[in-house]
């Protein structure tokens, strides 16, 4: 009888320890998710604000039939500054922040979760993922974020290409689109967005994670320096944006069709229209050189900020 009581108390203690361990693990998981959300939000906000004037200029060229050149782009920036003031260069940035903060928070947090899930599935717990799951984690993270925040991206594009008299604020854009064009307009361009996000996010995260892994292997240091992270992020942005750029042009044309005089159409009809009117290379890669300037800066800032914030928050928690 004494042995039975002793065995029962041992089992009870083991059960209590298991419950306690589960609670601690759950609390740690919640902290990790919140940490990723916060770090991602800050990373996205800093990166997009830094390149907002270049981003607005790129969108204006993407949705028009004007030929793009670096000279014309900087002339547009200069005349916008002269005619509308310095802060007008950031017009639409409030809408960008409303979209980018949740988008980046979701994307980075989802990426961490997908890495964990795929690591468990492929048997790489606590280790760097092999190439294919690494690419898949990035693509899934980008698709998740784009699906949840797409209407905000359309609103941002509308505000970037219209004069301030047309839309007074973000809510005004939503109201006018709903009344004049219908709610379904808020998802025009969604398909090319997702088709573009898959290679963009997949290749961006894949390149950045791969470069960090190679750095760790060859340098012997567990963590890169901040400037090295910036370089890795810049390379990731350059590769990701170059691969997905034509679909980005198609997406912008579809999003802004209601205010630029173009007809709403499918992906293929929009592609054909761009190629017919402007040519394949000039039309589908219009503004790419500006993206090669702003993309690496934005992605470098974004990835570096996220990593450094994660390190800081882990230290504070410990």
UniProtKB/Swiss-Prot annotation:
Record-level GO cellular component terms: mitochondrial inner membrane; mitochondrion
InterPro entries, per database record: DNA_mismatch_repair_CS (IPR014762), GDC-like (IPR002167), Mit_carrier (IPR002067), Mitochondrial_sb/sol_carrier (IPR018108), Mt_carrier_dom_sf (IPR023395)
Gene3D superfamilies: Mitochondrial carrier domain
Keyword list, A-Z: Membrane, Mitochondrion, Mitochondrion inner membrane, Repeat, Transmembrane, Transmembrane helix, Transport
GO biological process: ADP transport; AMP transport; ATP transport; coenzyme A biosynthetic process; coenzyme A transmembrane transport
A Pfam family: Mito_carr
A GO molecular-function annotation: ADP phosphatase activity
Compartments in which it is found: Mitochondrion inner membrane
Solcar repeat residue numbers: 31-117, 129-214, 224-312
Record-stated family: Belongs to the mitochondrial carrier (TC 2.A.29) family.
Role summary: Mitochondrial carrier mediating the transport of coenzyme A (CoA) in mitochondria in exchange for intramitochondrial (deoxy)adenine nucleotides and adenosine 3',5'-diphosphate.
Protein name (Swiss-Prot/TrEMBL): Mitochondrial coenzyme A transporter SLC25A42
The organism's taxonomic lineage, starting at the top: Eukaryota, Metazoa, Chordata, Craniata, Vertebrata
């Amino acid at each position: 009888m004494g042995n039975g009581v002793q065995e029962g108390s041992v089992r009870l203690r083991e059960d209590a320890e298991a419950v306690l361990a589960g609670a601690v693990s759950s609390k740690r998981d919640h902290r990790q998710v919140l940490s990723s959300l916060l770090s991602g939000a800050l990373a996205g906000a800093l990166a997009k604000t830094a390149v907002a004037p270049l981003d607005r200029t790129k969108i204006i060229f993407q949705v028009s039939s004007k030929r793009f050149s670096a000279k014309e782009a900087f002339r547009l920036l200069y005349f916008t500054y002269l005619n509308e003031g310095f802060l007008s260069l950031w017009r639409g940035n409030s809408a960008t922040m409303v979209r980018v903060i949740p988008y980046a928070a979701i994307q980075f947090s989802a990426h961490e979760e997908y890495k964990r899930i795929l690591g468990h599935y492929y048997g790489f717990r606590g280790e760097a993922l092999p190439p294919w799951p690494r690419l898949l984690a990035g693509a899934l993270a980008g698709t998740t974020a784009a699906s949840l925040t797409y209407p905000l991206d359309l609103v941002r594009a509308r505000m970037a290409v219209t004069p301030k008299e047309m839309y007074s604020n973000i809510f005004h854009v939503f109201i006018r689109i709903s009344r004049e064009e219908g709610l379904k307009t808020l998802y025009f361009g969604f398909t090319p967005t997702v088709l573009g996000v898959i290679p963009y996010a997949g290749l961006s995260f894949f390149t950045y994670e791969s470069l960090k892994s190679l750095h760790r292997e060859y340098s012997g240091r567990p963590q890169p320096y901040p400037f090295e992270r910036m370089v890795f992020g810049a390379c990731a942005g350059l590769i990701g944006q170059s691969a997905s750029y034509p679909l980005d042009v198609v997406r912008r044309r579809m999003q802004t069709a209601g205010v630029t005089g173009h007809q709403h159409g499918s992906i293929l009809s929009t592609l054909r229209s761009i190629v017919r009117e402007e040519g394949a290379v000039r039309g589908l890669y219009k503004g790419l050189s500006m993206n090669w300037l702003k993309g690496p800066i934005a992605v470098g800032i974004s990835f570096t900020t996220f990593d450094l914030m994660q390190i800081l928050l882990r230290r504070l928690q410990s």
